[in-house]
Structures are given as structure tokens and as C-alpha cells.
């Protein structure tokens, strides 16, 4: 979920690979899997609570989709992702129900100005978030979800950014 506060700042959560296979850290949006019986909107609301303690948010439509493959915590994932936009009052209570792997992987939660995200281009998940976030912050929601599936060069750049060598 790309969630904005009233000042158009976006919430990002610092992440690290607890297995140490992915060097460095990154900043990611709240999100996770879709449980049986859920649609993507229901899963988005649940994940906002689990990962950020956000209980009140105006959830918008799915704005981005992507297919990604990655390894995290020693597990390989191959998944389709449906990313919604949301607005909230900026109140986060901290994680409300992290799974064990998330509890050892997640660090600081921070509201970033979109200007800082674009200027500093931190390593993010989704990989291509920086390319598309300004439109969402300005309220420009696409009529249909945009496919932001990373290409090989996006993944290589992301990996290189976390490698201190």
C-alpha cells in the first residue's frame, strides 16, 4: 500500500534480509500476501494494521501491479502483487501483528516527503516506486493499474545499491 499522510508524505518501513543474503537495507511500503478468501483491498487494509498499526485509512484503488521474484529470509518468492493507494491522518501505532520473519527484518518506520524520495532515490520495494510516486502524491490515480514489473536492469541496479563494494 502506498499510503500518504495529510502532508503528502509516504510511509516507508526499513527492511533488511534476516538471512543476510541480500546486503544492506531498503525502504518498503506496507504490504504482504493475500490470505485465502481475501481480495487485494481487504489484504491491503489488514497489512496496514499488521505492519504499521494504521486502522483508519481511505483505501483507494489498485494503482500498480507487478510480478516479482526474490529471495528473502532464505525463502524464494515468485508472486503477483497488487498495490493500492491510501490516505490516512498520519497516525501509526507501530506494527500491530508482524509475522516472526517480519519482526526480525523490519526496522524504523518513517514518513518521507515525496521530494526526499525522488531526490535521494533510496533503495525501495517496489523497485520502481521512485519512477511513479510523484503522480500518486499529486492525486493523479491511473484509470487502470500500471504494470511496474521490474526489468533485469532495475533489479541489477537495486542489488548494486545495497552492496558496499
Predicted regions and their residues:
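Nudix hydrolase/Nudix homology domain
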Residues: 93-165
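Exposed, low-complexity/repetitive linear segments and helix-based recognition motifs
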Residues: 14, 25, 78, 144, ...
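N-terminal strand-loop-strand
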Residues: 1-28, 56
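Generic short beta-strand segments
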Residues: 14-16, 63-68
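A generic membrane alpha-helix/interface feature
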Residues: 18, 71, 131-133
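Unchanged
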Residues: 34-58, 66-125
Amino acid at each position: 500500500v502506498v499510503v500518504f499522510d495529510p502532508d503528502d508524505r509516504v510511509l516507508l518501513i526499513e527492511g533488511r534480509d534476516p538471512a543476510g543474503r541480500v546486503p544492506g537495507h531498503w525502504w518498503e511500503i506496507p504490504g504482504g500476501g493475500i490470505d485465502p478468501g481475501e481480495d487485494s483491498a481487504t489484504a491491503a487494509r489488514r497489512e496496514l494494521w499488521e505492519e504499521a498499526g494504521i486502522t483508519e485509512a481511505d483505501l483507494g484503488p489498485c494503482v500498480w501491479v507487478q510480478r516479482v521474484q526474490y529471495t528473502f529470509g532464505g525463502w524464494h518468492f515468485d508472486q503477483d502483487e497488487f498495490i493500492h493507494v491510501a490516505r490516512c491522518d498520519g497516525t501509526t501505532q507501530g506494527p500491530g501483528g508482524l509475522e516472526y520473519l517480519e519482526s526480525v527484518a523490519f526496522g524504523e518506520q518513517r514518513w518521507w516527503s515525496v521530494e526526499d524520495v525522488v531526490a535521494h532515490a533510496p533503495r525501495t520495494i517496489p523497485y520502481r516506486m521512485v519512477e511513479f510516486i510523484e503522480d500518486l502524491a499529486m492525486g493523479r490515480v491511473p484509470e487502470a493499474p500500471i504494470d511496474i514489473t521490474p526489468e533485469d536492469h532495475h533489479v541489477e541496479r537495486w542489488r548494486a545499491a545495497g552492496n558496499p563494494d
